[in-house]
Amino acid sequence: MNKLIRRIVIVGGGSAGWLTAGILAAEHTAGSAPGVKITLVESPDVNPIGVGEGTWPSMRHTLQKMGVSETDFVRECDAAFKQASRFDRWVTGTKDDSYYHPFTPPHGFGEVNLASQWRALAPDQSFAEVVSHQPHLCANGLAPKQITAPEWAAVANYAYHLDAGKFGLFLQKHCVEKLGVVHILDHVKGVKSADNGDIESLRTEAHGDIEGDLFIDCTGFSSLLLGQHFGVPFISVKDTLFCDTALAMQVPYPQPDSPVASVTISTAQEAGWIWDIGLPTRRGTGYVYSSSHTSDDEAERVLRDYLQDFDGSARKISINPGHRESFWYRNCVAVGISAGFIEPLEASALALIELSAAMIRDELPMSRQAMEIVSERYNERFRYRWDRIVDFLKLHYVLSQRTDSAFWLDNRKPETIPGHLQRLLELWRYRPPSHRDFHELEEIFPASSYWYVLYGMGFEQAGVDPKRSDDPGLARQYFEENAGMTEKFIRGLPSNRQLIDHLVKHGIYKI
């Protein structure tokens, strides 16, 4: 029971499997004799779902720690720079209905109650435009850094849009060639259990039994180990988040030098929403919708209307919104879709993989006895994180004022809103969201994210007595400083297209 965990077997490739392998291998020197041995087994016949085309800024640190070159990553993964999410037609459904959720916290956040002063001091501007420079950079199609900036550095916080299929292959090559991960292409035909109920080995078609101390399930919707072998129950959240189907389409640009958006665009529709992601060579688009509120044929018509009758083929993806009751059971932990999946409204899928793999990494090398403690903590933390993701995504629907379809009306019914979110909304009628409302040091959505969505969607607060933190003079100072930074950045930054083209041709200066 006190034997250290030295052999990790990851089942399944794609972004989940290879990102997990890279995060673990980089820290635990998988390619050296004293390091942890990491083996990834994947079927040669199974294609990853490949919908995760948006990341969070955390991906920069993750890739840098893995020893990846940002130049190589952008070139080989068809990656572009992302600075925010933009939500169109979510509030009223009109053409001018739009707000931003940028990656930078509000300027002056935590120093003064910006929300209480925004409407009085800047009534003609949206909240995000007053407190952050990034909505203006996105609106002007600008990049987050200068052409001369080194890898990973920036003047504006950024993440990426990427080709998920190319990303998985890029990580595979890096993990095998640079980090010592053993790659086996084979079919897993069964699971052999140890006397204590753990997984002892995987039975494969051509490589015999593959033994391990810790098994990581990255098999996607099939959840081969955690779901099928161990039978860990699945918790559906479809009564809260209705979207259960997606139609995805890849759309070419009309010209090779077409602008590349530095923002993920989410446009609300009668039964869901359309994502629109800009890559250097194409756009990734799709309609996420509730099959209880529209038909597949109608959904495809809506998507093609949005794309102005683009005649390419659409790929249908069925979503069972929810997650496993526990994510780590005995000596098996699920990462990625095998742990759970919901609509990609705030691009949390890849971020959850990063967080999952990072916690596994930080607890190694553990003993089998210590694994009981680690798994308990892991399950507690990720159940909390899943609950907060569901809350945050539901918030977008709860605050909508749309009345044009049953989908939007049903989303505001009290019985569909998590109790935790209802209690927070009642508190926030009298004060802005605070870090005190959340319990994790690494919140998946911090208080500043709630500010952007609440005030972007017109959330009204009750009149309260003024406090010292409502200082209008200090708020005006921060608003003016943000305006000054915005003007400076607009003058000095290249377009997203210019930066990407220069990077692909000449590379980025390495620190």
Question: Model-predicted segments: where are they?
Answer:
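Short FAD-binding loop at a beta-strand-to-alpha-helix junction that anchors the flavin cofactor
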Residues: 327-345
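N-terminal Rossmann-like FAD-binding beta1-loop-alpha1 element of flavoenzymes
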Residues: 6-35
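Low-complexity, highly charged intrinsically disordered N-terminal segments
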Residues: 96-170, 174-178, 218, 230-233, ...
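Predominantly flavin-linked oxidoreductase catalytic cores and closely associated redox partners
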Residues: 149-299, 357
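Glycine-rich FAD pyrophosphate-binding loop
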Residues: 25-51
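Dinucleotide-binding Rossmann-like beta1-alpha1 core, especially the glycine-rich loop
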Residues: 47-138
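Conserved FAD/dinucleotide-binding core of flavoprotein oxidoreductases
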Residues: 268-319, 340-351, 363, 371
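Long, low-complexity C-terminal extensions of enzymes
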Residues: 362-511
